[in-house]
């Protein structure tokens, strides 16, 4: 890895003004997730960002001990294409003016709605990658040649292991090659599953970016650091919550907000209320259900064009600046 001059232990301010979904795509590492590949946390962070920027409003209803939370589309002008895909997905669940969050999990367990969600989700990902994460832009921060070689080695290793195991399984004199094939298969599968940033490497620019985002994540996860260096306003807290969602640690920031902010401010804050009334939990459950149902469908049958939402057109959708 290239050496950089950056030496800070943590970051208590957002390092760069990249869209939350872009931060999620580049600076979170998981099995099966490549660098520059947004995932479900990025999708949820996009929704949280739309709430924070007042494109979505949070409405609540209380009946006895029952609390219900809804989303309401407030405006759409000026959104990026990937944000418009999210709006189209949410609009599908409108009843009157309100989006009924507790109805989304039920609907996404059905094939028709799950197909639609998967189509939206794929188009959302592709829209982000086209605008912010094309090959040239990713190449400025990350070199994935090593990751490609590792995956090739992995697939060749699995194939070779299967062949050797097949040829030796019934030969009592070939126990050593048989067990060696099992070891090769395990090693090869690990090579295939490794996150890209382990065999690949960051450029100097990319290394500095990822170290700053890691340190910002460390700050958000450490309650003592937040207590020592708290955000200066509710608006900053809300922005931190958006990025925490992208980084997969939203619960840490919500807990810190409970301790640091007055109850009245919390009750007037759409971002906090969305979590407190269970809106975020409902959304997470719904999206997991939709993806699970869609995956089952893809295994069981060939998905046709039914439910295809089409591409977003031009019109009045504004364009933000490039990431990085």
Region spans (language model):
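Hydrophobic, membrane-inserted alpha-helices
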Residues: 155-165
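Donor-sugar nucleotide-binding helix/loop cap in glycosyltransferases
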Residues: 26-157, 274-279
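Hydrophobic alpha-helical transmembrane segments
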Residues: 166-187
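Alpha-helical transmembrane segments
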Residues: 1, 163-165, 187-198
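Generic signal for short, ordered secondary-structure residues
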Residues: 22, 29, 107, 188, ...
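Short hydrophobic helical membrane-anchoring segments positioned at the boundary
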Residues: 115-119, 123, 127-128, 133-150, ...
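Short hydrophobic/aromatic-rich motifs at helix boundaries and adjacent loops
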Residues: 18, 185-189, 212-214
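Toprim catalytic domain recognition across nucleic-acid enzymes
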Residues: 1-26, 60-67
